[in-house]
């Protein structure tokens, strides 16, 4: 199953692509990308999110009045009559200040990325600003960890 998790934004969106093998319960990071949706954002969003033909797209819930909410509605509509499931989840990290949540996200990303790819150093050297890719990575990983917990619960 191909999972695309997205850190929504106009200037600095990022997305992580995972391959989740539910027979062996293994997760592999296929790609992690940053983009720019400032010009012709609808086309850019559609291009980025269909590049890897995902089975599931994970989006982080936005505030009611957030300008990024329109992107969520666009993505849900874009995939409405398709085989791609769109899931909107609460943020991975809660509480504390915005700055502390971003730091926590980056720390967890740096700690865990090598478990899912052999290209940790390439990724860390490619991006100077890690918070967006860290958020997309952690959002996808959080979703897959919840799938694994459900599998373990149902097997007992």
Swiss-Prot record:
Superkingdom of the organism of origin: Viruses
Signal peptide boundaries: none
Gene3D superfamilies in the record: Ribonuclease H-like superfamily/Ribonuclease H (3.30.420.10)
Cofactor note: Binds 1 Mg(2+) ion per subunit.
Annotated TM spans: none
Single biological process term from Gene Ontology: DNA repair
Keywords noted in UniProt: DNA damage, DNA recombination, DNA repair, Hydrolase, Magnesium, Nuclease
Cofactor(s) listed: Mg(2+)
EC number: 3.1.-.-
GO MF terms, alphabetically ordered: crossover junction DNA endonuclease activity; four-way junction DNA binding; magnesium ion binding
Enzyme class: hydrolase
Family: Belongs to the RuvC family. Poxviruses-type subfamily.
Free-text function comment from the UniProt entry: Nuclease that specifically cleaves and resolves four-way DNA Holliday junctions into linear duplex products.
Full protein name: Holliday junction resolvase
């Amino acid at each position: 199953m191909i999972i695309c998790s997205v850190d929504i934004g106009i200037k600095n969106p990022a997305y992580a692509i995972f391959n989740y093998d539910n027979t062996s319960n293994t997760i592999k990071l296929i790609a992690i990308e940053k983009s720019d949706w400032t010009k012709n954002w609808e086309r850019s969003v559609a291009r980025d999110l269909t590049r890897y033909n995902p089975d599931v797209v994970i989006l982080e819930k936005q505030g009611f009045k957030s300008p990024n909410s329109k992107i969520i509605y666009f993505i849900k509509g874009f995939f409405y009559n398709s085989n791609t499931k769109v899931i909107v989840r609460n943020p991975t990290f809660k509480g504390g200040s915005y700055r502390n949540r971003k730091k926590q996200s980056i720390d967890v990303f740096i700690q865990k990325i090598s478990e899912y790819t052999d290209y940790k150093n390439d990724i860390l050297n490619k991006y100077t600003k890690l918070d967006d890719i860290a958020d997309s990575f952690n959002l996808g990983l959080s979703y897959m960890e919840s799938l694994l917990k459900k599998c373990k619960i149902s097997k007992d």
